[in-house]
Amino acid sequence: MTSVAQRQAQPAQPSTSQTAAPTRTQTETSSPAILRLRGAHSNGRSVQWRSDVVDNEGLGRKKSKVCCIYHRPKGVDESSDDSSSSSDSSSSSDSDSDPEPDQDKRITSGGGSSGRGHRHSHDHDHDGREGGCNHDHGRGRKHGNKGKKTERRPSPNAYEKMPKYKPKDGGAGPSNSETQGPGGSK
């Protein structure tokens, strides 16, 4: 215990430490920067729709996406650009009413007759004279006006077809409770 008493008897030496903090004074000599924006505020939307653009979704609004814009197809008597038509594409809906130009593509690119769309024809008289027959021998498309070549109206693509909507009943549609009956289950 003497060691504890000796420690208590010794006077504690004060520890000295100094912290010096430099002080700075800043004087602002420049004026505050002012940012000025130029240009008028836009009034409304920047998209201007043509008068022939139709609301294709039936939601009361028009959008700028391609799938939501419907342009009415032009009539036969109206002029149209050849570059905007899709007659060069080879889809099955276009080939249903096409006159015979696709046959040449099929023969040269197909290399053989697959039976689908193949047209079998003969070089004999089809007007009923000299024992000729009055019907088509082919399994392909039949055309009544072989002498006349009429230009067909281009069929609309998926972006040009107007969707058919079911009429709304005034509500949000039939609920499960209406279709299930009074018991609540079928």
From Swiss-Prot:
Compositional bias of kind Basic residues: 138-151
InterPro entries: PPI_Ypi1 (IPR011107)
Main location as per UniProt: nucleus
Biased composition (Low complexity): 82-94
Skewed-composition ranges (Polar residues): 1-32
GO CC, alphabetical: nucleus
Location within or outside the cell: Nucleus
UniProt keyword terms in alphabetical order: Nucleus
Ranges where the record places region Disordered: 1-186
Entry's Gene Ontology molecular function annotations: protein phosphatase 1 binding; protein serine/threonine phosphatase inhibitor activity
Source taxon at top rank: Eukaryota
Basic and acidic residues compositional bias, start-end: 122-137
Purpose of the protein: Regulator of type 1 phosphatases which maintains protein phosphatase activity under strict control.
Recorded family membership: Belongs to the YPI1 family.
Protein name: Type 1 phosphatases regulator ypi-1
Origin species: Neurospora crassa (strain ATCC 24698 / 74-OR23-1A / CBS 708.71 / DSM 1257 / FGSC 987)
